[in-house]
């Protein structure tokens, strides 16, 4: 049976941001097992910034990507193992290693205006026989027509699904509808569309529902919303809403609720929620993974994290520029750079 939605869990990849990329092997195994039993279609696992994302800038992981991937591949019986690669961070060699470790799905992520740098990775993924997905991050920064043109490039390179990715949790339902509509009108009928929402404006579930209503099939979500910023669309909440809409999804709602409350929430050293800092991410349109970096810079330079994030939004900063938050703090406080 073809279901109304394909549920792509991101607890073990985007959720890495919420634990500073410090999931243990035992935690990954337990969460993956619970997700598999609950019925999700795929489980994405990697450093929060994708394959090879462990750096001085992003933060190092407690384990390697391959160790995490192998753990999930061993734990699951039916769900597909997915991973993320960002060209310029992860290489084709990293992708090949991930495939050997057990990943069969890969999302190739670029900034929403830079799809052209995904060609090599998408081509390689297809050659490896992987389910290959284009992932257009910070989609709110492109107009619907411009985003659709970038999606068409990814489709041309070989992607069989392309995502609208609200990395900043900055979009409202109208924004999502316009972008999904534009992709659906531009891409081949056989090319699927996905939605990756963040909850910074408390619209993660609403935006995901809107995307499906406008033609998206794949939906990213995470247990207890575990993810950068205020988190992703909470998986258990989305599934409950899907039930109310009579959508077929293949998941056990109670099992998802139990996994969220018993396995994931206890791991949060900072609550994944909408608060003054995470709300500012969405309001200012800033990449959600900036949260921890902004809080660290704010503490060091005695400045409100919201002020840093609002200025980052004004400057149009994107993923990978987290270190520039220190520059902003120095500019705003007049501190000595020496």
From Swiss-Prot:
What are this entry's molecular-function GO terms?
2-isopropylmalate synthase activity; 4-hydroxy-2-oxovalerate aldolase activity; manganese ion binding
Q: Name one Pfam family in it.
A: DmpG_comm
Q: GO annotations under biological process? A: catabolic process; L-leucine biosynthetic process
**Residues binding substrate:** 13-14, 167, 196, 287
Q: Would you indicate the residue range of the signal peptide?
A: none
Can you give the residue ranges of the Pyruvate carboxyltransferase domain? 5-257
Which InterPro entries does the record cross-reference, listed alphabetically? Answer: 2-IPM_HCS-like, 4OH_2_O-val_aldolase, Aldolase_TIM, DmpG_comm, DRE_TIM_HOA, PYR_CT
Residues the record marks as site: Transition state stabilizer: 13
Q: Which UniProt keywords apply?
A: Aromatic hydrocarbons catabolism, Lyase, Manganese, Metal-binding
Cross-referenced PROSITE patterns: PYR_CT
Catalytic center residues: 17 (proton acceptor)
Q: Which CDD domains match?
A: DRE_TIM_HOA
Q: Superkingdom, according to UniProt? A: Bacteria
Enzyme Commission (EC) number: 4.1.3.39
Binding-site list for Mn(2+)? 14, 196, 198
- Record flagged with keyword Manganese: yes
Known catalytic reactions: (S)-4-hydroxy-2-oxopentanoate = acetaldehyde + pyruvate
NCBIfam families given in the database record: 4OH_2_O_val_ald, PRK08195.1
Concerning its family, UniProt says:
Belongs to the 4-hydroxy-2-oxovalerate aldolase family.
Q: What is this protein called?
A: 4-hydroxy-2-oxovalerate aldolase 1
> Can you name the source organism?
Mycolicibacterium vanbaalenii (strain DSM 7251 / JCM 13017 / BCRC 16820 / KCTC 9966 / NRRL B-24157 / PYR-1) (Mycobacterium vanbaalenii)
């Amino acid at each position: 049976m073809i279901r109304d939605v394909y549920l792509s869990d991101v607890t073990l990849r985007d959720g890495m941001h919420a634990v500073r990329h410090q999931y243990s092997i035992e935690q990954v195994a337990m969460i993956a097992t619970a997700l598999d039993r609950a019925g999700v279609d795929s489980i994405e696992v990697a450093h929060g910034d994708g394959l090879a994302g462990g750096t001085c800038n992003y933060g190092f992981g407690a384990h390697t990507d391959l160790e995490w991937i192998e753990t999930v591949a061993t734990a699951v019986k039916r769900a597909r193992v997915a991973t993320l690669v960002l060209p310029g961070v992860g290489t084709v060699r990293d992708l090949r290693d991930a495939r050997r470790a057990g990943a069969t799905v890969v999302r190739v992520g670029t900034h929403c205006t830079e799809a052209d740098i995904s060609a090599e990775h998408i081509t390689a993924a297809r050659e490896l026989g992987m389910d290959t997905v284009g992932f257009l991050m910070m989609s709110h920064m492109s107009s619907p027509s411009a985003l659709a043109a970038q999606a068409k490039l990814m489709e041309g390179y070989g992607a069989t699904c392309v995502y609208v990715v609200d990395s900043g949790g900055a979009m409202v339902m109208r924004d999502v509808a316009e972008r999904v509509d534009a992709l659906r009108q531009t891409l081949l009928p056989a090319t699927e569309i996905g939605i990756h929402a963040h909850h910074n404006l408390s619209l993660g579930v609403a935006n995901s529902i809107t995307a499906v209503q406008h033609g998206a099939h794949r939906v990213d979500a995470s247990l207890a919303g575990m993810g950068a910023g205020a988190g992703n669309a909470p998986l258990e909440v989305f599934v409950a809403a899907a039930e109310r809409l009579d959508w077929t999804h293949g998941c056990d709602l109670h099992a998802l609720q139990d996994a969220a409350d018993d396995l994931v929430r206890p791991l949060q050293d900072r609550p994944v929620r909408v608060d003054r800092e995470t709300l500012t991410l969405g309001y200012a349109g800033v990449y959600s993974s900036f949260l921890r970096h902004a809080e660290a810079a704010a503490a060091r330079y005695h400045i409100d994290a919201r002020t840093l994030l609002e200025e980052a939004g004004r400057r149009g900063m994107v993923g990978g520029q987290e270190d520039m938050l220190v520059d902003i703090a120095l500019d705003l406080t007049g501190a000595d750079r020496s």
